[in-house]
Regions:
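Sec-type signal peptide cleavage vicinity
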Residues: 2-8, 14-337
Length: 337
């Protein structure tokens, strides 16, 4: 299935809510609504740009009567936000504030399928696969009286992963001939010898997942997925036939666990090429991150996107990396010789 940045399809699902609470709701009750903003965020592929009617964001909204704890929820369900912090969104089946006027606490998770978040308590955990954006919105509080006055909570969704985009280019015709097609790209290392993580735990009260401590479950190899200049696909970059040219072109992307970068050996990519019926050539390429001024990038990569340009030379592969939106942070380059 091909996905272009963000699907315009807004999926609404039935929200669950306590029948006891609803039975106490009098006529003229006030509906629970919320607004949303997103920091340059995509749906299952990376969410890009600003929330709008043509670029909606469907998220899971959890509602609790207990500050910071969503084990026992007042309501939960999907809300589809269609603009950036202006228009309120509702649950598919309207839900209402408690008749006693007590305060409610709301937080947001993306993707919107609650089942994928495991057992929800003060936190929620999810395994990610490289093609799915993970976002969270910190807890907000709201009450019936505030809603009656026209004040609704605004949920700000933030990226919790790091986006890597790989561009491929051959230095010259000799390199094209020497390497053949690129067949496989994967992430096999981070911060030198460490393996990449594949699971995140989000603290719901503040909507955070601290780089390092909130990530777990290492894997030997983490997938990249095919893409073009403007389209993200959910097809793994495995057994592909990507033809090298002398013009750099987007080839693959992955949404990976963030790291604390040092600017040396930040990521390690495994690149496989094959020329005709020859045996495949496998290379591991270290990627050193650079910032937007082409100096060494150090620090947290969460919420940032890096563009990695792999240059194939007749004798080696070289890598460079640079940052692009989501949040501009830097670049990386590499050569394959």
């Amino acid at each position: 299935m091909k996905k272009v940045f963000l699907s315009a399809l807004a999926i609404a699902a039935m929200a669950s809510c306590s029948k006891t609470e609803l039975s106490n709701t009098p006529d003229g009750s006030v509906e629970i609504k919320a607004k949303s903003t997103a920091l340059s965020i995509s749906t299952k592929s990376p969410y890009e740009g600003t929330i709008s009617s043509g670029n909606p964001l469907t998220a899971q909204v959890l509602v609790s009567k207990t500050d910071g704890n969503y084990t026992s929820r007042y309501c939960d369900g999907e809300m589809t936000f269609s603009d950036d912090g202006t228009t309120e969104a509702s649950f598919a089946t309207p839900q209402y504030y408690p008749a006693d006027g007590s305060v409610l606490y709301l937080c947001g998770l993306y993707p919107s399928d609650l089942g994928g978040w495991g057992t929800v308590t003060e936190s929620a955990s999810r395994t990610f696969d490289g093609k799915t954006d993970i976002m969270a919105a910190a807890q907000q509080q709201s009450s019936k009286s505030e809603a009656q006055a026209g004040t609704y909570p605004t949920m700000q969704f933030k990226h919790l992963l790091t986006k890597l985009v790989v561009k491929l280019v051959a230095e010259d015709d000799a390199a094209v001939t020497a390497w053949g097609n690129v067949t496989d790209i994967s992430l096999v290392g981070v911060n030198g010898s460490q393996k990449p993580y594949s699971k995140v735990e989000v603290t719901l009260q503040d909507g955070t997942a601290v780089t390092g401590s909130a990530f777990s479950t290492t894997v030997e190899s983490f997938s990249f997925y095919t893409m073009t200049e403007n389209t993200y696909n959910d097809v793994a970059f495995s057994a592909q036939t990507f033809a090298l040219t002398k013009t750099a072109a987007n080839a693959a992307y992955s949404l990976v666990a963030p790291i604390t970068a040092t600017g040396s050996g930040d990521f390690k990519l495994k690149i496989t090429t094959q020329k005709n019926a020859d045996s495949p050539l496998v290379n591991e390429v270290a990627v050193d991150l650079k910032n937007t001024s082409n100096s060494t990038f150090t620090g947290d990569t969460q919420g940032k996107a890096f563009e990695i340009t792999l240059t194939f030379k007749a004798t080696e592969i070289q890598a460079k990396a640079s940052v692009k939106e989501w949040e501009k942070a830097g670049t990386a380059t590499g050569e394959i010789k």
